[in-house]
């Protein structure tokens, strides 16, 4: 475990260096007329070729490259740098342990500045795949090996030896042949012998055939892997086998080692893959008798030894592996010459991706690379001629054209009648002939009876097909309010808003149903539509929603369909709260969901409906038992399908539907389930319409969503490979839903380590996890609710008195109350209207905000309640809503003194030097209070005391606290010694003449009160206030201060600014 952790740390630390070393190293070793190729010399037992031979092959290739460059008048230097693995820490013993070795060699290249224009090697699949997985290889890599499927379709990888994919395509094509003179039957079964000790090429060839979701496995009805020689011998000689065909990889000697001296059954065919042996074509080669039942797949001799010099140079201890290194060097020289002649840059990404879809002159003749950078060959299938005991060509396979070409007309091999046997034991031409004659006789007898029965059946069936259930509208009932909720833990339900607009939930026959709009107004369906509705009515399966019939409501026709409480699968995937990844949406559940969809589609394809046509995640719904059901099927004649992200490319080009198109839609849904992201999620494209366009108009590599195969483990990789096979561009390569269903069952067994756990056991275990997660979720939501409640209470307490808020929460109403004695405070700003005339709206708002914020801080230090602000008026009361004895007059008086002290030090920001004067009026008396209104409720005061307090303020003087005699009387009853002066008789509108007072301070406390203006100052202010404001504005401009410019609104027009101010005729204190 420690070593694995260390390896992971090394890879993480090393990876950034690999991503950036290309830009610096290539400029040193691939420019200014000097070009190098870096050759990785990894010593392991998988390839028995001495490294010295490989080096000699590369150097010989460089000699040829230099010669060709000179002939092309290109005066450049071409060399090779050989990097050996002698000093590596993770030196491998064979290819299956060389994962770290390739990365270590890359690090050595980076450190020693040896990286050239291209990289030769490694040859091991594991090492090559790991390098592409952990690094960004922005340079061409040429490999003499890397046969595995995991190395397919790499943008910068070129393979000089045939990969496993090419072999697999040949076997599939050969199995399908049924029109050759020597092979009248197509094969659908096979055994694969793989014991794990094969050489590197055989290991990956057989691994591709063994894979459960490979192309070879998909086209076969039966395939089994034999891993022990005893199993191989039993199949080779026994009668209890399921196929006559066995595929293995190796040499004739390795076949004999496994077979021994056992007698092979006459109808057995062994396909021996031995691509790199040349002795089959030698003149002195005689086939042994144990090879009679063997067909050998190899590369023909002209591909590797047609050149006399090649035969001479590679006959002494060398192999096709050495030739591959030489050919790779020639390929590098060919591309270098091409780019230099065209004046193009050999260090850019174009050069890295140019090693494909071309033909160059190799050492043994022309060499062709396909559009994936893999070599194309002509493979030969050989048989043993009983006449000459020589190997002869039976068929040839062109990997470039993907075409099998029969060569032999009447091959004299061991099988009867010069024909290969059937792959199924016991079936052959003779047995088939007997079966045909027997069945013909029976059919003739039954045919006459069937014709009579068929005629009557067709007549009855035609009448029955046109009938369907039309439900009277009286049988459809709306749901109660408490029945419309769906199963979810999400607090908000906005995500279902659009769905509710499209579908209607009702009740039919005591069951919840959904009304699906059929876009039909009169209900006069055509004959074809009636037949489709009848098929819908007859469909009844566990993973399909039930169709009950049609109903006419108002002027529209609806389909009545079974309702599933948890909504669509797309909604479930979006709801990460109700269905978290750690419990419900784990891999087992995802596979169960895929299996439910596959079962439903498998039944649908085998039913009379035959095809869905609109399969997508929004048409897969989940019921209360977490069973996924398919809906919205069978109405293609009524609701034709539309183009969307789930539509197969062939149906985007032509508006049709097919079962293979449903398989493609299943793959898109599977990608949604696996990644739990948006539909057709891909990092390379986010636009919906562009995705559809790129799928419809695929050029080269088809456009598909992301799957992130790099992060998948072995079990998850099986699911990913299944998904990729389902969205193949060629519909014929996609599996059917029966195959998908069986593959998912095998994958589900892998996640349980082959344990026999039923679906109910899995569901119960998942519900237990879900219950524990729900407890934590409820606790978390409770904490969030309490925090939100406290915030709401705090806001309510800022708007209404605390007692009023509690009464509203507990009773829902607030009873109005009469208070015998309270004190009310009024104040306003002198000259407010004149200030507004010379100020912008934002300056007025800022001024009032600065003043009121300071007033509010003062109010918080006294037992008073701020009632409201009206323009420049500020209203405060004490003694309500909580009574406080005689303290109400004391608290209002102290607050008034504090406010007046603050005003003495306050200065307007936008009018520096301008004095701010306020008038304050205070009165005590009885008052009524209560909450008025429903929208924006306010705690309002009513009574003559409120009006009198307002009159006290309006008849007062600037920087003075004007108090009524009732307030002074209350103050005298307290222990507080306030200082006041008698103003004299003052006329109060509505009350007549009363004696009023000026509050000037307290004996035991100092207040920094501003000096009230004299009568002369007041008169001067009335006449010169506008001039003082203009002078303050000029002073602000001279000092360089800028006021904040307000954002103009639509209601602002040219002319003077206007301000809204609440004012009555009696309250004229803001005017002089």
Swiss-Prot record:
Keywords: Cell membrane, cGMP biosynthesis, Endoplasmic reticulum, Glycoprotein, GTP-binding, Lyase, Membrane, Nucleotide-binding, Receptor, Signal, Transmembrane, Transmembrane helix. The keyword RNA-binding does not apply. It is a single-pass type I membrane protein. Residues 489-748 form the Protein kinase domain. Its main location: membrane. GO terms for molecular function: ATP binding; GTP binding; guanylate cyclase activity; protein kinase activity; toxic substance binding. Residues 823-953 form the Guanylate cyclase domain. Residues 1-19 form the signal peptide. The chain crosses the membrane at residues 434-454. Pfam families: ANF_receptor (PF01094), Guanylate_cyc (PF00211), PK_Tyr_Ser-Thr (PF07714). GO terms for cellular component: endoplasmic reticulum membrane; plasma membrane. GO terms for biological process: intracellular signal transduction; regulation of cell population proliferation; response to toxic substance. Residues 455-1072 are cytoplasmic. It is found in: Cell membrane; Endoplasmic reticulum membrane. The keyword Endoplasmic reticulum applies. It catalyses: GTP = 3',5'-cyclic GMP + diphosphate. Glycans are attached at residues 32, 75, 79, 179, 188, 195, 284, 307, 345, 402. The protein kinase domain is predicted to be catalytically inactive. Guanylyl cyclase that catalyzes synthesis of cyclic GMP (cGMP) from GTP. Homotrimer. Interacts via its C-terminal region with NHERF4. Interacts with the lectin chaperone VIP36. This is Guanylyl cyclase C. It comes from Mus musculus.
